[in-house]
Every structure is written in C-alpha cells, then in structure tokens.
C-alpha cells in the first residue's frame, strides 16, 4: 500500500511539473532602459508595475551585454536569438553591400519597390533575408504547428528583429495604424483590423504630455519640453511644444505611445485565448521603442525621461492586471522584462566639438589614404563603430587589404575621441579574452562588419543634432541592463550572479519546453 501511495505521489508531482510549464511567454523589452532605473525611481512607481515584477519574480542585478557595439539592433537580435552579434550579424539598421558598394537598410529590399497609389494595410518593400539566425519565436513555432507568436513594436525594424522571419509581426505605420509586411502575411487578421477601425491610436496621440508630479517629487532637475509645477495646483502642467500635424510622430515621441502599445497588446492576448488547449505554446513579444526615443532626445538625466518611466510604469501595471485576469493559474504565463541596451550619460557641455563627427572622419581619412596611395574613393562609409573600406579600389591599386586596414586603425587612434581601433584582420587572426578588443570581437561578424572597428572614449558619442545621448559603447552604462523573469512557478529572488543577455533566449526555451534557437550556444541561467 505504501509503495502504491509513493508511486501515485510521484505521478502527481510529474503531472504537476508538466502542467506548470507556461503556455504563454510575454517578453517585454524597454528599449534604452538601464539596470539601475527601477531602483533609482522606485519611490514614485506604483505597486503593480515594475515593482510587482521585481517583487514576484527573479531579478538579476548583474546582467550584461558582452559585445560591442551595444546598439539597439544588436541587443534585440541577441535577446531574440540567444547568441552574440558575431553569430547573428545584426548590429546596425544600415549595412554595406559589398557587391553594390553602397549602404542598405537591413530590413528593406535593395531593389526599387513600385508602391500602389492606394494605401494598403500590409506594407511593401520589407524583407527578412538579413535575419539568418533563428529567433526564440521561430523556435516555438517550429516545435508545433499549433503554437503561435505575435510581436509588437513601435518601429518596424524592432518588431522584425524580435520576430525573425515567421509569426505575426506588427508595428506602427506612418498612417497611425498597426501594420505588417507582405513577407509575414498578405492581409491583417480581423482582430488587428478591428483595433485600427476603433482609431484608438489617434486618441492616445492627442493626449497632452504633462508632468505627473510636482517638481519636488522628481529626482532629476533638467527639463526642456514639459512644464512642472512647484506646488500642487488644480491646473495640470502641460507641454510647451505644440502637437504636430502629423499626429503619428507625436505618438512615437510621447509617453502615451507606451499606453497605445499596451492597449494593442491586450487585444493580442485576447486573440490568443484560450491559452491552454492541445498543449499549445504562445509567445507575445513587446518592444517599447519610445523610452529610447525620449532618452536620446532629452537625456536619461532629464525630467522628461523620468516622467516617461512613471507613465510607463502605470501602463505596465494596467497591462499586468489585465494579463493575469485572463489566466486562472498564474504559472501558465512567464513574463520577462529586460532592455536592448542602456543609454549614455548626457555631458553638461554636449556641443558639436565634443562629439565624434563621423562624416568629417570619413572625409579626412579618405584624404589621408588618397595622399598616401593615390586619389580615389577609399572609404565607403561608417556606421555604429564600423568603418567600411572600398575593397575594389584597394585591389585596383594593388594594395594589401590588411595593410590599408592597419593604416586606418593607426590613423583613427590619433583622432580625438577614439579610445580603440582594431582591424578586421586582427580580429580574425587572434582570440581576445578580455577588455575592449574582446567585446569588439564578440560583435564582429566577418560577413557584415566593417574593416576597422572603433570604440570611443567614455561618454563621447557620435554627432547627431537630433540626439543628446545614444548607445553603442563598450562601457557599463550601455552594457548593464535589467532582467526580471516572473511566473511559471519561479520563486521571488534577487540574483547577484553575473549573467549575459544571450542567455535569456535559451533559458526561456527551457522554461517553455521547446528547443533553444539554432545558433544559441549560451548556458541556461540557473536559479
């Protein structure tokens, strides 16, 4: 009798373990969010947003990106594929086609697209050919035909990188609706069309951006656009800037845009219901691009960025309440919150002379090479720390590619603001285990990276008149990101051990009971 009881108990435990496997994974990426943001601003957060996830889940306080450049594109691709840029090859929105010798957008078709005069709900001209590494969403879909994946972002590139080449992928179109591309589907499903017909996005865009609190409750003090009252008043603070005639641009640059994406995410969750049928497994990816937009425009030390986080926290709380209301058993959902990368601090004297002028660097370097080897177009261009040389010109002058690369690296190191310059030949010839060069090597893809990889000095950024801060450096303010995993029976805990962002995808794959993405060789996080 005791033996039968023990066997029955073991069977019940085994069944419970199987049932504990989540049927829905919600992956939330707050673009540009640094690891310390939740702790820094927790005094004004509500209990049901960021603090709920931190209180009920596993918080990894030492999660890093171990590669450079730490761009948004590289971060999203690493989160999605579970491998570093050296493998997945995505580190910028722009790459250089060696055949055409010109810059191309990685998610756009290179050949001209004949756009229809009639506006379509499904957009043309997009391609997923650059996304060669399998994503977590694609791995989930490959494990069963019944599984489903939905990815939502403000920007098309963010959505496409997270989704990969399969599944449902939506972003905010220039018309202000949620749209997709022909490479994903030929027409929008009814639940998306119904949301667009409600014109909720237009309602969110007309909302005025005002400070949520009085000035004494903010940690930051610098402000550019919004008015913050020193005392409580019946009259709410409001933004100095007028709403643009193009209301879509406002939706992409105001905190209310985060609310819009969470409202659409609720519809996505409803479209996935019921969640527990035929052992199905479903993934919902949400990328919030607006935090990065605001951080780059105003700086992470601005009241604008701080106020946006408070609004985002409220929107997140509302979404989590809705999400858990749909699931009678919370173990059936696992929620992951992380970031693609941090953002650089804003220098007090952040003028043009303190920036790295990429165009000026290209021109001066080309003049240097022309004086040394003969007049010609030696430089193709520069993007996200990668300098591309014109190989056709180098070979036509019968010069060694490695020699020209070395000359460029030596020249770059003499340029103000450059901390490190290493050639592609050096990265292919040796293995570096520590320091800046090791990070650059992990971000170097032989097929897509440039001829010389450049790292700037701390807090120095590239010249861009529309941004006061950006990511991409080798330093901790860009590499140190938040990571919280909540649900699926995970016990609340604060984990101080060091982990990396390429471990997230294989860890979630194990939690969900599916094969890890094909290119991922990172260790599963133990907890």
List PLM regions with ranges:
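Short, structured active-site-proximal loop/turn typified by the sulfatase FGly-forming signature C/S-X-P-X-R
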Residues: 38-88, 148-152
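Non-catalytic, well-ordered alpha-helical segments in soluble enzyme domains
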Residues: 51-52, 133-142, 384-421, 497-523
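A long, amphipathic alpha-helix that forms part
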Residues: 37, 251-277, 291-333, 508
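Substrate-binding rim/cap in mid-to-C-terminal beta-strand-loop elements of soluble/periplasmic
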Residues: 360-401, 470-512, 526
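Sec-dependent N-terminal signal peptides
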Residues: 5-14
């Amino acid at each position: 009798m005791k033996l039968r009881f023990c066997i029955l108990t073991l069977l019940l435990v085994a069944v419970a373990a199987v049932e504990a496997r989540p049927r829905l994974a919600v992956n939330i990426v707050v673009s540009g969010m640094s690891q310390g943001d939740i702790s820094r601003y927790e005094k004004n957060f509500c209990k049901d947003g960021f603090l709920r996830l931190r209180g009920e889940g596993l918080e990894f306080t030492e999660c890093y990106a171990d590669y450079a450049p730490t761009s948004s594109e590289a971060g999203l691709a690493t989160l999605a594929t579970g491998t570093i840029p050296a493998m997945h090859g995505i580190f910028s929105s722009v790459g250089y086609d060696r055949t055409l010798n010109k810059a191309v957008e990685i998610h756009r078709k290179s050949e001209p697209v004949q756009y229809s005069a009639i506006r379509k709900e499904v957009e043309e001209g997009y391609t997923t050919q650059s996304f060669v590494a399998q994503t977590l969403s694609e791995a989930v879909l490959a494990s069963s035909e019944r599984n489903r994946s939905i990815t939502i972002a403000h920007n098309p590139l963010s959505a496409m990188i997270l989704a990969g080449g399969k599944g449902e992928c939506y972003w905010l179109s220039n018309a202000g609706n949620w749209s997709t591309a022909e490479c994903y589907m030929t027409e929008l499903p009814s639940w998306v069309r119904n949301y667009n017909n409600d014109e909720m996005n237009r309602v969110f865009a007309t909302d005025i951006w005002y400070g949520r609190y009085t000035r004494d409750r903010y940690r930051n003090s610098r402000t550019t656009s919004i008015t913050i009252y020193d005392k409580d008043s019946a009259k709410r603070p409001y933004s100095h800037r007028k709403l643009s005639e193009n209301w879509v641009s406002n939706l992409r640059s105001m905190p209310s845009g985060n609310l819009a994406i969470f409202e659409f995410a609720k519809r996505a969750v409803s479209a996935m219901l019921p969640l527990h049928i035929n052992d199905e497994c479903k993934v919902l990816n949400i990328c919030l691009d607006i935090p990065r937009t605001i951080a780059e425009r105003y700086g992470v030390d601005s009241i604008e960025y701080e106020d946006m986080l408070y609004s985002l926290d409220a929107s997140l709380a509302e979404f989590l309440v809705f999400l858990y209301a749909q699931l009678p058993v919370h173990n059936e959902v696992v929620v992951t919150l992380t970031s693609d990368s941090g953002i650089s601090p804003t220098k007090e004297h952040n003028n043009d002379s303190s920036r790295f002028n990429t165009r000026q660097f290209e021109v001066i370097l080309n003049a240097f090479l022309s004086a040394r080897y003969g007049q010609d177009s030696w430089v193709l261009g520069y993007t996200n720390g990668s300098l591309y040389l014109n190989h056709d010109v180098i070979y036509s002058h019968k010069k060694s590619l490695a020699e020209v690369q070395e000359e460029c690296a030596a020249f770059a190191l003499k340029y103000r603001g450059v901390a490190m310059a290493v050639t592609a030949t050096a990265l292919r010839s040796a293995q570096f285990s520590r320091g800046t060069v090791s990070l650059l090597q992990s971000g170097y893809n032989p097929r897509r990276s440039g001829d010389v990889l450049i790292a700037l000095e701390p807090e120095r950024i590239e010249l861009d008149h529309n941004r006061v801060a950006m990511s991409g450096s080798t330093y901790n303010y860009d590499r140190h990101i938040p990571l919280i995993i909540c649900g699926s029976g995970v016990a609340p805990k604060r984990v101080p051990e060091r982990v990396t962002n390429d471990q997230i995808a294989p860890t979630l794959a194990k939690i969900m009971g599916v094969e890890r993405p094909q290119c991922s060789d990172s260790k599963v996080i133990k907890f």
